[in-house]
């Protein structure tokens, strides 16, 4: 692709109540002679060839330069995609936009390196940018990951708008409604090409949309400087946890009780089984103190969880080959981390949330197996517990 030319086109994001554009999404195009190279192809070629970060930086810089030439001035009037690796590497900080933009991420970014992504999202918001989750509904895992990022904007995958109603669509609608309840989040539906698509988009809760019913992508944007921008919530409080561990998060709000390790094991098994019923929409985060606490039966259960669920992370001191062999993502607990005294399991799915947190009563007498524990199903508290595990640890 050495002789290919990179350029940017813009597709409008319209207010569904008026049909008027409020913002535009920047889309990268690559042309070699008279041949237009499909975006998925040149990105896949770059990924295979190890040039993804370089290509994404070129796309980012070209989009910002073209938007500046077109006269974009208002905050959040430009939506721009960024690869997870580029976002984590701080591309937007190295080549900063002149005004706050909407940064689009897919749920695979959370699956890849959740801790780093959450930290970068908080940094982006601190700089005035907004975070959008793109292609929501394309993969079931995104439904459980949504509350961890708590985006300002969700973009519904065009499949949800264009395909016939199904049980899967109903499940996604239910999960989306549950997440949006009480939140001032903008919902953008992609792929609106017919009046029927528009009806479906509205039924899904979309307030804004994109698609050929309104306009194809264009090179020149009329009145770019007059765009109002996507209407975001008045403020977004970043949710980086103050507490360092799940036990500290939950025990501050829920009364703790004494328990023996044997009961905690059975409660953990129950929550693990509940996670498996949700399949690839489930997130499971578990701490085991020392890897020597993990029995052969537990290794087997976590191999099954890793095969079935969207994201499974195990935390322990002394990572063993048997734990790595489960297929779960494994993170070692550092010496001195208060997590070494905890037995925790956090489960998040599209329609279920639970956090079982326990702290050893006397770590110097580990053989006694005595803990204080708390169990909560309050989703907001479970999300906070999950973020405390992911922060600086995943």
Where on the chain are the PLM-derived regions?
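Short loop/helix-cap segments at secondary-structure boundaries that form the rim of catalytic
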Residues: 92-96, 146-149, 201, 320-328
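Structural motif
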Residues: 81-85, 106-107, 134-136, 190-192, ...
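Structural preference for beta-strand elements that scaffold enzyme active sites
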Residues: 5-7, 23-25, 75-79, 100-104, ...
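Bacterial c-di-GMP phosphodiesterase EAL domain
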Residues: 1-97, 259-266
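EAL-type cyclic di-GMP phosphodiesterase domain
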Residues: 31-58, 84-130, 158-178, 195
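EAL-family c-di-GMP phosphodiesterase catalytic domain
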Residues: 1, 11, 16-20, 30-33, ...
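Non-catalytic regulatory/interaction regions at protein termini and inter-domain linkers
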Residues: 226-394
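Anion (oxyanion) recognition and catalysis
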Residues: 125, 181, 202, 306-307
